[in-house]
Amino acid sequence: MSASTAAPARDRLRIAIQKSGRLAEPARSLLAACGLSWRQSRDKLFCYGESLPVDLLLVRDDDIPGLIADGVCDLGIVGQNELEEQAAERRGNGLPAAYHAVRGVGFGQCRLMLAVPEEWDWQGVAQLAGKRIATSYPAILADWLERQGIEATVVELSGSVEIAPRLGTADLICDLVSSGATLAANQLKPVELVMESEAVLAGAVREPADARAGLLAMLLRRMDGVLKLRDSKLLMFRADQDNVDALRRLLPDADPLVQLPDDGNGVLRLQTMCHGAVTWQRLEELERAGAQGLMVLTVERSLA
């Protein structure tokens, strides 16, 4: 099916995620936190949604953008780098991407970087002129080189990019970097950022207008709640009215304080949602400022 052909009406939402790899488990955990559960097929590539009419397709990450563009899947969780690589490739072929990043999902952070042999004295991007650069992301790299005004040869490799300089097939590489350990093991050093990336929820530019529309809206609302609460804690404490302003200043990343019914002795009962780390040091600061009976609670679900 071409990207311009309307997808057939369906009453079940279909989401593509990585079958295996670094995004597979976090993606399934995120969707499970949204209340989804599945029954896996014998071939282990299709998971039938049981709690909601939302099915999973387990595929290679580089298949996900195309499945969305062709209307086979409504959504996918995929690296932004993979999404942009295929979008750039489609633009180069005169085709619309037909998909977009709906939102980041809070994991899979990495950087697409140029890396050179450790012995290079790196002076800047002007050194790239005439060089051979090995990468698995040729379209992104070609776009970046064009913006920099650099003429270089892009050597496309599907894997093991980091050994290309040692094999003599390239002078340097452009590859994803998380910790930098793989580069160091191959006597390479990162020198220039090409793209920041993370896992994203991707969807079709044209959203479904049939029964899937309501499912999509519900899933996105649940996902917003899960992502908002991922690093959030409910903080409850008591305090005198005179100390409230000082306590509020110690909670810049928290929602407005909510006053609960007091017990009649003039001490206020307060609670707030903190969206940053609630460390022991932070609790001790609050205590010194007048907070009493501090409690930190995990919140599993929220509909705002």
Curated annotation (Swiss-Prot):
The protein's Enzyme Commission number: 2.4.2.17
Transferase found in the keyword field: yes
User: What is known about regulation of its activity?
Assistant: Feedback inhibited by histidine.
Report the catalytic activity. 1-(5-phospho-beta-D-ribosyl)-ATP + diphosphate = 5-phospho-alpha-D-ribose 1-diphosphate + ATP
Question: Gene3D superfamilies from the entry?
Answer: 3.30.70.120, Periplasmic binding protein-like II
Top-rank taxon of the source lineage equals Bacteria
Q: Tell where it localizes.
A: Cytoplasm
The pathway noted for it is: Amino-acid biosynthesis; L-histidine biosynthesis; L-histidine from 5-phospho-alpha-D-ribose 1-diphosphate: step 1/9
One GO cellular component term of this record is:
cytoplasm
Among the Pfam families in the record, one is HisG
* Molecular-function GO term, any one: ATP binding
**Cofactor(s) needed:** Mg(2+)
Give an example GO biological process.
L-histidine biosynthetic process
Q: Which UniProt keywords apply?
A: Amino-acid biosynthesis, ATP-binding, Cytoplasm, Glycosyltransferase, Histidine biosynthesis, Magnesium, Metal-binding, Nucleotide-binding, Transferase
What family is it from? Answer: Belongs to the ATP phosphoribosyltransferase family. Long subfamily.
Sum up the protein's function in the record's words: Catalyzes the condensation of ATP and 5-phosphoribose 1-diphosphate to form N'-(5'-phosphoribosyl)-ATP (PR-ATP). Has a crucial role in the pathway because the rate of histidine biosynthesis seems to be controlled primarily by regulation of HisG enzymatic activity.
Q: What's the protein name?
A: ATP phosphoribosyltransferase
Q: From which source organism is this entry? A: Xanthomonas oryzae pv. oryzae (strain KACC10331 / KXO85)
